[in-house]
Amino acid sequence: MSGKQKPKFEVRGYSEHKAPKPASPSASTILVSPNNEILLLHRVQTSSAFPSAHVFPGGNLEPSDGEVASDPTDVNRHLENIAYRTGAIRELFEETGILLARESRTAESLLPVSTAVRKEGRESVHKGKVSFKSWLSSISPNAVLDTDRLIPFTHWITPPNVPKRFTTQMYVYFVDPAEKGNPSVHATADQIETMTPEWRSARDWLSLARSGDIILFPPQFLLLYLVSEILDGPGDSEEDILRKRAILKRRIETEGTPVPWKDKFISPIGMSFGEDGRSVLALDKPGPELKASTLKGDDEYVVLVKFNREGPRDVEIGLRKEVLRERRERGIDKPSKI
């Protein structure tokens, strides 16, 4: 890239970074509305992570969320557990004001909490004046976080060449159609790290990214792609909505190669690049910290992406075998330095 500014975001081979920065445990939630729309946040330019990108709500775990192993190479540090689930719900609350909690362990519906009470609690939790769990107990003594309804949906580890790295557990949460009038599921901006939260269909988010109107990083793009294939299918009745959710849940829990999507650990790695300016990212490796483990990524799909100064552009998902064959036949494929 002689004479040009280097892209802010790239993905290269593991071999180029023998000692990557430790990956911070974090969690993120793909929140599905009663109408099967997806909530994304637009991070401001000065945000500490993924500036100007549209992202799922989420962030770093805190000690109050629960214990995770301190050694970055310890497999247990990366495995899904109650700390990740608690962190996902806490971060969702801090960033959007949405509260996924029930009045008790036996309650079926979400705890309704007014906008004013949530706003005050959100500010206190974010500033560290009170822990998230303590605040919840103060407004409803028997309340519990709705961690059981979080569905694990891949775990991502930032590539080794990126200075700020995360080991991120992704979840899906379906807001029950019966909760439409519950104030606890109404999102508002936090005025700190994000702009206004917005609900759109997964199809619409992908379309905006393809047209260049928004930035989606490869993990968000891939997960929206997989969600859109099912949730954006025909039918808008409540019966259709619930049917499509059941299909998506089954896909996450039982489909995928070599392991189901709920069990995939993915650290994108540059596989090849072409004269079209796009890299092909393989998704089958779990990351340098986990290379000695039995954890696996995905060997069916690849991500095609062009890394520009402002972030990833021209992102697309393809079947690995088909993409590599087509690029070789067209003569636009070159091996990476892996």
Spans of model-derived segments:
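N-terminal leader/linker segments that precede catalytic domains of diphosphate-processing enzymes
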Residues: 1-338
